[in-house]
Amino acid sequence: MNWFTRVRNSLGFGPKRTTDKDLWVKCPSCAEMLFAQEYEENAQVCPRCDHHGRISADERLRQLLDEGYEVLPQPEVAEDPLKFRDSKKYTDRLKQARAKNPHADAFTVGSGAIDGHHAVVGVQDFGFMGGSMGMAVGTAFCAGAERALRRKCGYIVVTAAGGARMQEGILSLMQMPKATVMTRRLREAGLPYIVVLTDPTTGGVTASYAMLGDVHIAEPGALIGFAGQRVIQDTIREQLPDGFQRAEYLHKHGMVDRVVHRHQLKHELATLLGYLQPAEAA
């Protein structure tokens, strides 16, 4: 027995302390270590650099809607009609995503009020397969629009998606015109359709309902575009401006109406509903 072993054995060690792994979070922008409770109480906005973190659909609904709102059930759709498989079965990917998420797919609809103004809010959750748009997302989007038409109130959609869901092929792309038809019905009914663009909003979602709103609001720093910057540069063989797909650049060039901090978003939406919503609904 050497001296180190003797000393170690003579020391009295208390029980091993356990630490909650969720006690701290690291800001993806400034890399600052943040106390998780402080971060959550600040609407998951970094108090150091003001980076807006990605949040779940449930948290978004809690932030935007008054107490007592209703979460609509997820419409039933055919699962995996193409029997798709890449490195694993599509059905297995869905099971994995659902094991980490309380909802059946990436689009959740809440019906309630925003500072007293009746509203239906649809939220895409990037945490569920990158928020990708498939049949379930398209059907849920339309169900939210139908609820707004019945209630004669505004429809607010918060986007966060990597694009169409490749595992559903053409059936995924069919959701683009389907959602577009619903936005037209809202317009014909004189009901406001407001889009909140969050990080990231790309691909087929950007090419359809994300850019068809009466008003487009973006969160600070949100990535918004169709194709990625590298793909565009390789196609046009030109260097693109810094931040050309970020919310602030798009606002400066007229693609976005407002860039609104998450802390002010609920008030901003309530103000817009007061202006745009029919008197009986407002």
UniProtKB/Swiss-Prot annotation:
Positions of transmembrane segments: none
GO biological processes: fatty acid biosynthetic process; malonyl-CoA biosynthetic process
Annotated EC: 2.1.3.15
Domain of life: Bacteria
Keyword Zinc: yes
Coarse class of the protein's main subcellular location: cytoplasm
Catalytic activity: N(6)-carboxybiotinyl-L-lysyl-[protein] + acetyl-CoA = N(6)-biotinyl-L-lysyl-[protein] + malonyl-CoA
Enzyme class: transferase
UniProt domain CoA carboxyltransferase N-terminal: residue ranges: 23-282
Any one GO cellular component localisation term in the record: acetate CoA-transferase complex
Places the protein is found: Cytoplasm
Example GO molecular function: acetyl-CoA carboxylase activity
Pathway assigned in UniProt: Lipid metabolism; malonyl-CoA biosynthesis; malonyl-CoA from acetyl-CoA: step 1/1
PROSITE patterns reported for this sequence: COA_CT_NTER
Cofactor(s) required, per the database record: Zn(2+)
Cofactor notes: Binds 1 zinc ion per subunit.
Keywords from the UniProt entry: ATP-binding, Cytoplasm, Fatty acid biosynthesis, Fatty acid metabolism, Lipid biosynthesis, Lipid metabolism, Metal-binding, Nucleotide-binding, Transferase, Zinc, Zinc-finger
Keyword Repeat: no
ZnF C4-type: positions: 27-49
Disulfide bonds: none
UniProt family annotation: Belongs to the AccD/PCCB family.
Reported function: Component of the acetyl coenzyme A carboxylase (ACC) complex. Biotin carboxylase (BC) catalyzes the carboxylation of biotin on its carrier protein (BCCP) and then the CO(2) group is transferred by the transcarboxylase to acetyl-CoA to form malonyl-CoA.
HAMAP family: AcetylCoA_CT_beta
NCBIfam families: accD
Binding partners and assembly: Acetyl-CoA carboxylase is a heterohexamer composed of biotin carboxyl carrier protein (AccB), biotin carboxylase (AccC) and two subunits each of ACCase subunit alpha (AccA) and ACCase subunit beta (AccD).
UniProt-recorded name of the protein: Acetyl-coenzyme A carboxylase carboxyl transferase subunit beta
Organism classification: Bacteria, Pseudomonadati, Pseudomonadota, Alphaproteobacteria, Sphingomonadales
